[in-house]
Amino acid sequence: HLPRVRAPAVVPSLLVSRPVFLHPRTVARYPASLHNARPEDCLLVRLEALALPSVRAIGLACRPLHDPAILVTEYLRHSLQYRRLLMRVPLTADGYRDRLLDAMASLLVDLHRAGVYWGDCSLANTLFRRDGGTIQAYLVDAETSETHAALSDGQRAYDLEVLVENVAFGLADLASFQ
């Protein structure tokens, strides 16, 4: 007996994700080349083992000699994309934007301490969970990420430069809709 599958409405995002409800859990699937999907799957498994905030890899579906593969992750319950989070609460809300940025900064610090170079830190590659007045950021796209015994100052600086540029772009893009 196969589980009941229902396709929900697709949430607009730069990252093409297709959530699928498989009773009793929900998974997200991301098409990617096998060349990129295999290391991303391994990295997500490593992040889970290190108890770092990220989506949980379930597996990789591929057919020999065919691309794209499908990276399957557990859907992060009660999480929101930054667009949904900030569309509900304006950027000008008292301290809200600062808490969101603090959550991203904390995530990046945790990743760097564990020797993880993100490579594409952005609002679009992050999911957020609210819990009262706090916000927790989760890495959702690890396609460009790498793990090392320790990061060099240059790797940390470049990751931070990418974060600043991508977050500024994401916030400017969002402000144009408000």
Functional labels for PLM-detected ranges:
Residues 1-86, 90-94, 98, 102-119, ...:
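Conserved ATP-binding subdomain of kinase catalytic cores across diverse folds
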Residues 77, 123, 144:
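Short, glycine/acidic-enriched loop or turn micro-motifs at the edges of active sites
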Residues 135-178:
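C-lobe/activation-segment region of protein kinase-like
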Residues 75, 130, 142:
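Residues immediately flanking
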Residues 63-64, 130, 154-155:
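A general structural signal for short secondary-structure junctions and capping/turn motifs
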Residues 121-128:
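Hydrophobic residue at the +6 position relative to the catalytic HRD Asp in the kinase catalytic loop
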